[in-house]
Amino acid sequence: MFRTMMNGKIHRATVTEANLNYVGSITIDSAILEAVDMLPNEKVQIVNNNNGARIETYIIPGEPGSGVICLNGAAARHVQVGDVVIIMSYGMFTDEEAKTHEPKIVVLDEKNHIEMILPEEKAHTTL
């Protein structure tokens, strides 16, 4: 049996752009992607802390160090510039792999620079 587990998480990213006329996706600073082991074209779930919206799309890498978090296409309808979002990727793991898997989690500051890297998500963690 395989279980779907969180593999990477970008916590408290601030939306820098929303481009309705682009052909879908989310553009993410590639330095952030590297820190959480996310790849171009990988499916991600985005949760908007401001309005509760949950959407899925795929990743386009942005300029490293730019701090870009841009929702494109229809996804742009679910955010405003300045909204705080959580971006998560998932992987399929066997039961044995799932028991030892540790997702990569980063917490960003208000300019989308990595503020801290968490080794794993603890229950009831408040940032």
UniProtKB/Swiss-Prot annotation:
It is an enzyme of class 4 (lyase). It comes from the Bacteria. Pfam families: Asp_decarbox (PF02261). Its main location: cytoplasm. InterPro entries: Asp_de-COase-like_dom_sf, Asp_decarbox. Keywords: Autocatalytic cleavage, Cytoplasm, Decarboxylase, Lyase, Pantothenate biosynthesis, Pyruvate, Schiff base, Zymogen. The active site is at 25 (schiff-base intermediate with substrate), 58 (proton donor). Coiled coil: none annotated. GO terms for molecular function: aspartate 1-decarboxylase activity. GO terms for biological process: alanine biosynthetic process; pantothenate biosynthetic process. It is found in: Cytoplasm. PANTHER family: ASPARTATE 1-DECARBOXYLASE (PTHR21012:SF0). Heterooctamer of four alpha and four beta subunits. This is Aspartate 1-decarboxylase. It comes from Listeria monocytogenes serovar 1/2a (strain ATCC BAA-679 / EGD-e). The lineage of its organism: Bacteria, Bacillati, Bacillota, Bacilli, Bacillales. The gene is panD.
